[in-house]
Amino acid sequence: MDELTRDALNALPEWLRSLADDLAVLAELLKDTQLSEGLRLWVAGAVGYVFKSVDLIPDGIEDLGYLDDVFVLRLAAARVAEENSESDAPLPPSITQLAEGAALVKKLLGSDFARLDDFVSGLRIAVVRGVSPSDIVQDPALAAQVCDEVASFARSYVPPPFSHDERTLIKLKSFLSAKLP
């Protein structure tokens, strides 16, 4: 087993376990008016994706469900950290940790990473349940409502099982390669 495979098989189950907490930390940024609207659009798009009924990988698929969600959160966090690097508004350390995970996603997906990154960029304008990320960012009451929905999700979220098997990574990469636009 190579180092990348070992790193991924160790990280992915932990990412699945922390999904609810990671989502909650990101969602809290929606209410932080010190952050630019552009940064909060990244967050709103990623948070909306988790609640979207049509995922790249349906959440119920054994071993793979929610992995697309944890990837999207990390890529969005990386964009937030990157674009915030010259700002005076500090980000919570947990956002930086999420952002660091994007490097593993990039290594794992190889040539398909650019397609996922483009997909995540498009989430900034994706409408979920009739609400766009800009609606959320511009309306404090709507941002608070999204945070409440995230808190409700976090209370009921049960991390799915994950097989520490190289075949799981092969299935994951194949699924994303086939589904990414």
Q: How should each PLM-predicted stretch be described?
A:
Residues 1-20:
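Polybasic, low-complexity association/targeting segments
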Residues 31-51:
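Transmembrane alpha-helical segments and their cytosolic interface motifs
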Residues 46-73:
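Membrane-inserting effector segments that mediate pore formation, membrane fusion
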Residues 34, 61, 65, 84-88, ...:
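Long, hydrophobic, amphipathic alpha-helical segments used as structural scaffolds
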Residues 97-181:
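Intrinsically disordered, low-complexity, charge-dense segments enriched in Lys/Arg
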Residues 63-94:
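Membrane-interface alpha-helices
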Residues 22-25:
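Amphipathic, well-ordered alpha-helical segments in soluble domains
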